[in-house]
């Protein structure tokens, strides 16, 4: 199994074919539906955010899990996806986490069917 690098152009296609590979990524991966509900939350993201992945499935990412991501840049990109079903953007972000700002790089990429999008999260 080849290593999939962060920011890979075809990462969404690989995970659409082989969804179990999300668990083996060396960075966080969160799959959201068009309403922001978490469909998948990999172990790496669980480690980054100190959360049990099973506990966040079915919750709204922006309202229940990461309200600090509801800022203009992060949530604005997601709202574009919500409206169009398409997104492929990479940006730096600082999560307010336990009283500290944690720097991350976000790659938000829609699935080919336009019904869900991945948030790939890498600490910087």
From Swiss-Prot:
Keyword GTP-binding listed: no
GO MF terms, alphabetically ordered: photoreceptor activity
Disulphide connectivity of cysteines: none
Annotated function: This photoactive protein is a photoreceptor with kinetics similar to that of rhodopsin.
Post-translational modification note: The 4-hydroxycinnamic acid (p-coumaric acid) chromophore is covalently bound via a thioester linkage.
One Gene Ontology biological process: phototransduction
Modified residues (S-(4-hydroxycinnamyl)cysteine): 68
Keyword Glycoprotein: no
InterPro entries per the UniProt record, alphabetical: PAS, PAS-like_dom_sf, PAS_fold, PYP
Protein name (Swiss-Prot/TrEMBL): Photoactive yellow protein
Highest taxon above the source species: Bacteria
SUPFAM superfamilies: PYP-like sensor domain (PAS domain)
Domain PAS: 22-85
Keywords: Chromophore, Photoreceptor protein, Receptor, Sensory transduction
Family: Belongs to the photoactive yellow protein family.
């Amino acid at each position: 199994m080849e290593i999939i690098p962060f920011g890979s152009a075809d990462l969404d296609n690989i995970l659409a074919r082989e969804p179990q590979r999300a668990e083996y990524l060396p960075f966080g991966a969160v799959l959201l539906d068009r309403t922001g509900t978490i469909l998948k939350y990999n172990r790496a993201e669980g480690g980054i955010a100190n959360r049990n992945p099973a506990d966040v499935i079915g919750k709204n990412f922006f309202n229940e899990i990461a309200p600090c991501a509801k800022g203009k840049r992060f949530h604005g990109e997601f709202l574009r996806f919500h409206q169009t079903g398409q997104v492929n953007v990479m940006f730096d972000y600082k999560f307010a986490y336990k009283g500290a700002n944690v720097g991350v790089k976000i790659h938000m990429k829609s699935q080919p069917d336009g019904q869900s999008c991945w948030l790939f999260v890498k600490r910087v």
